[in-house]
């Protein structure tokens, strides 16, 4: 008997520049995303690559505009989202208000409701605060 469940269709989102002091080759980002989608039974649509200009989120914004043609986005990491809180939260709110979702392959997380929004924002705030902590 065939499974008639329709797979979610998510567009990949990768970086061509370092993010949060990390640098991951594009082909590795795509491998991680493809593996994540395979394990979650998600149809992976080829990745869009963010522009190399510092702080650019032009491709991410374009993906959000294109959401009506897919079920969501799968990014390599939550730390590829804009560092600016207002910009990041605006993008997340646009995704939620479209009844779509965004997944983060490395962290194994997805944003699809207010609880997941708050959880991901908490992770962001910890990551941004850690460099200012003196552990000695």
Regions found by a protein language model. Name each.
Residues 1-136:
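Short, structured surface patches at the beginning of a domain
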């Amino acid at each position: 008997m065939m499974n008639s469940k329709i797979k979610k269709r998510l567009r990949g989102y990768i970086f061509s520049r370092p993010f949060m002091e990390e640098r991951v080759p594009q082909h590795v980002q795509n491998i991680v995303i493809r593996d994540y989608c395979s394990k979650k039974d998600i149809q992976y649509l080829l990745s869009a690559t963010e522009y190399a200009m510092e702080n650019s989120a032009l491709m991410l914004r374009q993906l959000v505009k294109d959401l009506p043609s897919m079920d969501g986005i799968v990014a390599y990491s939550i730390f590829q989202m804009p560092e600016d809180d207002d910009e990041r939260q605006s993008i997340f709110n646009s995704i939620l208000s479209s009844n779509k979702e965004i997944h983060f392959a490395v962290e194994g997380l997805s944003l699809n409701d207010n609880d997941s929004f708050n959880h991901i924002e908490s992770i962001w705030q910890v990551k941004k605060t850690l460099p200012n902590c003196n552990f000695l």
